[in-house]
């Protein structure tokens, strides 16, 4: 999508522009899922025990992401990825994304996984410090990056997982919908604080919390309900399930969001869930609008059926705001002006 920014000088022009931009972005034929922590942190270690989904045309992932990176207003893009590309589940792609929206810098590398990521559970790890980013699989280092892009990973990031289908066949392969439904299984997640030299055995990390998904903890996790450019699916909370001690992300046809299968067995026992001390006063919730918390222009549905929508500066209903959610951000600026395949737009519903 590459829509030129237009200055609107009157209420009539605003209404006309809103009508012209109307697009049903929830009319996609497929539904995916995204899970994210409500808290963002600066530095840490993140581990997840997972059996990934894989079919040509899909992406099954674990990543760190600074909410709002996708907004083209000059702020930095901050992201660190583990992505299993469906065309080759025998490996995963590691990546750091920095720069700015429309001018991102990436550093993709590919790493073998055996057994294949969709055939067995593996423990995937990310370590993020001021000096390096390190990727591990089953406790073994597969990549470590120091300096360069790492110095640009400023601010905070939240932990996320998603399952979706890219429209870029060159990247992920031709989409094969006959393979649906697909499922990504997460047995447990551990998050560690960055505590240089003070962790177990003198390490730089101290365990903060563990989630074994015996139940879904809504005080810790949010369920995505959005889409983004280049995504064949709508990400929906209907495709996230907690069953038999496993968190499940699904990729399905629209209207068939469900999980009626058997949860696969992981031979490694899950740890007990634990909670960290409350940190909400200083954390940056990833479930907020794509603009910083200090902005007053984010759209928040009130108790009544209509509101002044900061997206278009007009009285409208939440449903209308939802229609326009991936065309403009909460500041009223056009998103993704350079048609980049990866950006996210949060919206209320």
UniProtKB/Swiss-Prot annotation:
- InterPro entries per record: Beta_glucanase, ConA-like_dom_sf, GH16, GH16_AS, Glycosyl_Hydrlase_16
- Its name, as the record gives it, is Beta-glucanase
Region entry 5 X 7 AA tandem repeats of P-X-S-S-S-S-X, spans: 271-307
Q: Which species does this protein come from?
A: Fibrobacter succinogenes (strain ATCC 19169 / S85)
What is an annotated GO biological process for this record, any one? carbohydrate metabolic process
Which portions of the chain have biased composition (kind: Low complexity)?
270-307
Q: What reaction is this protein's catalytic activity? A: Hydrolysis of (1->4)-beta-D-glucosidic linkages in beta-D-glucans containing (1->3)- and (1->4)-bonds
In terms of PROSITE patterns, this protein maps to: GH16_1, GH16_2
Task: Show the segment(s) annotated as Disordered.
Answer: 258-311
Q: Which residues form the GH16 domain?
A: 28-197
